[in-house]
Amino acid sequence: MSMLCYTLIIAFLIGIWAAPQSEDNVPLGSPATSDLSDTSCAQTHEGLKTSRNTDQRHPAPKKVDDQELGSVANIIVDPKLFQKRQFQSSRVLFSTQPPPLSRDEQSVEFLDNEDALNRNIQAKRQNHPVHDLGEHSVCDSISEWVTKTTATDIKGNTVTVEVDVNLNNEVYKQYFFETKCRNPNPVPSGCRGIDSRLWNSYCTTTQTFVKALTMEGNQASWRFIRIDTACVCVITKKTDNL
């Protein structure tokens, strides 16, 4: 009987010692810890996924350099660059609006000295009243404002010309006033008014260099480029009259 009592007491003590421990004292690697780790990992993964989706919906803004390189036609220019400009030409201008068809209009705002250009053109027209005196040009020419994307510089290299320039949060276009021949032979014999019995003649467009805003590497810079500026008559003496 006493043996039975001892057996029951020992079984009771073993049961107490083997009772489940509290969650606060759960050893590392237990199922409860695994559940917490899995939950934390799931939350972290969900956070990364949400962050990735947010980045896709709202991509990071491009750097200024990336924006300038990606859009060469609308590069942001430091106003100090225009202070360093030298050898300004009346044939190069920057305008927020298309320039007038005739250069004596004053409805467009230019960065260059528009008034001086207009006065110069008007003075030339007053000093040379071609239509009133019946005078004629040796060659017929046409003049107009144009934009350029490429041109030949003073070294003979092909360079990129700026079309749109962002200056003080305003977009200006770079225009060039070009003059070229309308027809190489205004009359069947060549140039008008040339004695075809003694001379061979034809009209040709000549060029000159003007300072323009171009791209050099990743930066804007001033360079001399060729543009059409005049139409002249070229004559050669006929060999059969020598």
Curated annotation (Swiss-Prot):
One of its GO terms (biological process) is nerve development. Keywords: Cleavage on pair of basic residues, Disulfide bond, Growth factor, Lipid-binding, Metalloenzyme inhibitor, Metalloprotease inhibitor, Protease inhibitor, Secreted, Signal, Toxin. One of its GO terms (molecular function) is toxin activity. Its main location: secreted. This is Venom nerve growth factor 1. PANTHER family: BETA-NERVE GROWTH FACTOR, NERVE GROWTH FACTOR NGF -RELATED. It comes from Pseudechis australis (Mulga snake). Disulfide bonds join C139-C203, C181-C231, C191-C233. Homodimer; non-covalently linked. Residues 19-125 form a propeptide.
